[in-house]
């Protein structure tokens, strides 16, 4: 009897185990499908991010084109071009601190944080508490912090040299991009900066997020209190031209309407004095982007870093070879501005020095050997494990720690453990898209990685709902990219639709998408979200545009002009802001026509002069001869009719 009971219990246990294994296998497959969906969504976000950065770098080519082709050959346009370069390459004409700050008083009615100079730990605490309450630091204090930071930064070398000990660790943080909650979480988990708790912040403090000013002020105040224990490296977004596109300029002007321009003027110079790297224990190189086969730390140590105003304005001697074949072979190669050999302006770096800085700010590691153009971003290079070994060995270093790239887990180890990427902005693309991370290390020990993710109410939703939301956001921005090239895509589709049936094969559709958009995406896997496919596998290519359109100021505007305006709206806004030297938000009709013709000639947008003249008359809404270009560019936006329900990537 006892044996029978044991047998029944054994059978029941087997069934329970079998059921548990079935559930476990199902859950593993479910998680694997979610990982595939996350991978594809992140690929979309990253490809479009890099494509946008590529466009930003190509503005450099446009500026060079204007200078080389119009200052001498076209008298009508030369005045405008000269003014643009005067505005973008001006010497910082900043008054001394007392004169500058004397114009801005802090009223008694101001109830935000008040700082006392010289700054102490108390001021750090006051600032953190105020920003937690979403208070705004007065412009007077912002400028005072910037002036103090500039004074201290000027005394620093290009590379900060840091020593650690077994009992004294150092923390390394990557990109924060205006995400204040991430910085607060890091300080909560890891402690505030101090003599016993040093930090390295590896660039890209600003842009994209909504609290770039708060992050910058916290970091600079901490730096001023602990200048030997908090180290700030320059990233590719510590650049006033990048800020015009990616949000920090707009944030400053919104938060500091009266004194925003003064803040921007001083900030531009502070950027140029930020160190370009940190070397820990003479073994670990910490830089924002990466390296190239020509990276020379001796050159980087000796150049005058404050001459690098922006990567968009690269100088080069007219008699020097542009030589570096890796740059010329890129389809989006940025041709630097040429100046006469005997007229190199004193504020310019040499071409070699400029390239050295661009490489360490913009480059990315790859598994493939060698060094080749970073065609995704349009600046810097891709460097392989052999390049890493060569550069580290040459400089008697053991490891490279860099940032610059969002990683799903917040960090990534590559090149046989010699390269570490750390990225500290969680939820960078969308809620749940990635974790943030920071690194702790001390002398003679392996780096320790700490991950986190800022949570919000949406994080309480089921996992599949969060994934659906992330996918939906990814496909929206991908469709916006597609609609901006609608005419080109349709021409490419029709080229392969020999029977004019409106259908082509999936392979032909995928080839056309990549050929026109150049995003290096798995188009076949993404096709179910983007286009209608019949049972035979044929693609109804016009269905790509069923649920999206570009809104335009007037119905009579031609499609190619509408798409061009939408596609280049960010570039045009930067250019118009530069032209608008008095910051009125207005440019004249003549300036509009001239700039459009220059832009059209360089970008080969195939817009004839009559269309430009017609466009100019349309956008002069009140017929006063001036154009409010910000309002004009806002008139071009994408309308999503609906989202396709019930589909997923896996």
Curated annotation (Swiss-Prot):
Residues 16-45 form the IQ domain. Activated by calcium. Binds 2 manganese ions per subunit. Residues 335-348 have a biased composition (Basic and acidic residues). Mn(2+) 1 binds at residues 175, 177, 204. Residues 124-456 are annotated as: Catalytic. It comes from the Eukaryota. InterPro entries: Calcineurin-like_PHP_ApaH, EF-hand-dom_pair, EF_Hand_1_Ca_BS, EF_hand_dom, IQ_motif_EF-hand-BS, Metallo-depent_PP-like, PPP_dom, PPP_phosphatase. It catalyses: O-phospho-L-seryl-[protein] + H2O = L-seryl-[protein] + phosphate; O-phospho-L-threonyl-[protein] + H2O = L-threonyl-[protein] + phosphate. This is Serine/threonine-protein phosphatase with EF-hands 1. SUPFAM superfamilies: EF-hand, Metallo-dependent phosphatases. One of its GO terms (biological process) is detection of stimulus involved in sensory perception. SMART domains: EFh (SM00054), IQ (SM00015), PP2Ac (SM00156).
């Amino acid at each position: 009897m006892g044996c029978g009971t044991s047998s029944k219990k054994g059978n029941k246990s087997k069934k329970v185990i079998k059921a548990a294994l079935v559930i476990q296998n199902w859950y593993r497959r479910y998680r694997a499908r979610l990982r595939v969906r996350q991978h594809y969504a992140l690929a979309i976000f990253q490809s479009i991010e890099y494509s946008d950065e590529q466009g930003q770098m190509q503005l450099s080519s446009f500026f060079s084109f204007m200078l080389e082709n119009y200052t001498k050959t076209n008298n009508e346009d030369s005045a405008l071009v000269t003014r643009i370069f005067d505005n973008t390459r001006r010497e910082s004409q900043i008054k001394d601190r007392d004169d500058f700050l004397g114009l801005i008083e802090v009223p008694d009615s101001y109830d935000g944080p008040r700082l006392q100079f010289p700054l102490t730990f108390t001021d750090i605490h006051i600032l953190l508490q105020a920003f937690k309450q979403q208070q705004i630091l007065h412009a007077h204090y912002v400028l005072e912090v910037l002036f103090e930071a500039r004074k201290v930064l000027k005394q620093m070398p290009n590379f900060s040299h840091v020593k650690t000990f077994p009992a004294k660790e150092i923390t390394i943080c990557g990109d924060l991009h205006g995400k204040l909650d991430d910085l607060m979480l890091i300080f909560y988990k890891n402690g505030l900066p101090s003599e016993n708790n040093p930090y390295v912040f590896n660039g890209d403090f600003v842009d994209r997020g909504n609290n770039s000013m708060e992050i910058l002020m916290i970091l600079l105040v901490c730096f001023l209190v602990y200048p030997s224990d908090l180290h700030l490296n320059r990233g590719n977004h510590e650049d006033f031209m990048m800020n015009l596109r990616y949000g920090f300029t707009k944030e400053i002007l919104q938060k500091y309407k009266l004194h925003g321009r003064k803040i921007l003027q001083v900030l531009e110079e502070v950027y140029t004095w930020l160190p370009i790297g940190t070397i820990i224990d003479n073994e670990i190189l910490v830089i924002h982007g990466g390296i190239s086969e020509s990276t020379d730390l001796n050159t980087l140590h000796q150049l005058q870093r404050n001459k690098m105003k922006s990567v968009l304005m690269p100088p080069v001697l007219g008699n020097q070879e542009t030589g570096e074949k890796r740059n010329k072979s890129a389809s989006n190669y940025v041709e630097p501005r040429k100046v006469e050999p005997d007229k190199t302006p004193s504020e310019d770096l040499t071409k070699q020095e400029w390239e050295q800085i661009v490489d360490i700010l913009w480059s990315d590691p790859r598994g493939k050997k060698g060094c080749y153009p970073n065609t995704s971003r349009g600046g810097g290079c891709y460097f392989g494990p052999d390049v890493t070994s060569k550069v580290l060995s040459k400089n008697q270093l053991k490891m490279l720690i860099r940032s610059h790239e969002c990683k799903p887990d917040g960090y990534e180890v590559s090149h046989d453990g010699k390269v570490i990427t750390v990225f500290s902005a969680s939820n960078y693309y969308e809620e749940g898209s990635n974790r943030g991370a920071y690194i702790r290390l001390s002398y003679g020990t392996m780096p320790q990685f700490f991950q986190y993710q800022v949570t919000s109410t949406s994080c309480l939703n089921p996992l599949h709902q969060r994934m659906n939301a992330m996918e939906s956001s990814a496909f929206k921005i991908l469709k916006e990219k597609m609609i901006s090239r609608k005419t080109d895509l349709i021409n490419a589709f029709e080229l392969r639709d020999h029977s004019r049936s409106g259908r082509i094969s999936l392979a032909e559709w995928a080839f056309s998408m990549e050929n026109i958009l150049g995003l290096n995406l798995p188009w076949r896997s993404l096709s179910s979200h983007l286009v209608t496919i019949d049972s035979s596998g044929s693609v109804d290519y016009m269905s790509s545009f069923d649920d999206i359109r570009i809104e335009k100021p007037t119905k009579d505007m031609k499609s190619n002009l509408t798409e061009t305006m939408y596609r280049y709206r960010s570039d045009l806004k930067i250019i118009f802001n530069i032209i608008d030297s008095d910051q009125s938000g207005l440019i004249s009709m003549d300036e509009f026509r001239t700039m459009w013709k220059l832009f059209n000639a360089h970008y080969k947008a195939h817009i004839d002069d009559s269309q430009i003249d017609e466009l100019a008359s349309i956008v002069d809404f009140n017929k006063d001869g001036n154009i409010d270009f910000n309002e004009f560019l806002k008139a071009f936006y994408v309308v999503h009719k609906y989202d396709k329900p019930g589909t997923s990537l896996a």
